[in-house]
Amino acid sequence: YWQPYGWDYGQITYTVQDNVCEVQGLLRGNTWNHLATLPSDCRPSGREIFNMNNHQYTSRVDVLSNGEIHWVTGGSSHGWLSLTGIVFVTNAGPKTGLPFNNGYTNYGHSYEGPYYSKINNECILGGLIGGGNGNNHVGTLPAGCRPRQGLLFNVNNHQCTMRLHVATDGRIHRETGHCHAWTSLAGVTFPASEATKTTLQLSNGWKGYGGYWGTPYYSLIKGECIVQGLISGNKWGWIATLPDACRPHYRLIFNLNNHQYTSRVDVLPNGEIHWIAGGNHHGWLSLTG
């Protein structure tokens, strides 16, 4: 039996806008299977595999085509699970099949085929990749749907977390966490290179990684605040602050990448972004996700 965590973490919410479904919030409970069910206008065409936060652990959470949300494996501690980071194009939305490289293909079965969509200047990816020859370059996005700087996403690989690199030339690379041969694209979204971006105000000595990885930024797209970029530093706590226009109503728990590790990063209603638990290695953290 699962229910909203409440307190500072508020309710579980979903929004559907222009055929994009997004889920946010924190659940508490202890039966690790069927967590919730989304309404008919907020469902994917096929099963999607998301990477959700469970404090220092990562959890595989699947959204099924009938709207059911299931915990599958990974972290099952603390009596809570964050659903923040579930975002996908619904079964009514426009999708284009991902151009594959190196023999990769649709995983098939009941899983969503790998796709990209460009909606309101935001690129949204999803689906499950199978096959391949073992090369880490799984597919390439077209010129209209590429990031302005290199981005590192934290995607699910069953009980493991995977670092997924979306390059400025559109290449998609799986870089750590090869626990299984498949690659999930669920949860990968970013503003297209021409979208408006504002430099993020960092704190506590954290800096943009620079060079190819650029400067961390936020974008406000139709009421959705998107924070992305790679930062370097070693004071693991308060990282940055978002302006009034880009703050959540309640505290949100994100699952972000620290190479082979997952990191819990919270965004507070006052705009502060804090590292809380999990990976704190390598002197860097990706805010992308």
What are these regions (language model features)?
Residues 4-11, 28-113, 130-215, 220, ...:
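Extracellular jelly-roll beta-sandwich "head" domains, especially the C-terminal globular C1q domain
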Residues 20-27, 122-129, 223-231:
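Short, well-ordered beta-strand segments enriched in hydrophobic/aromatic residues
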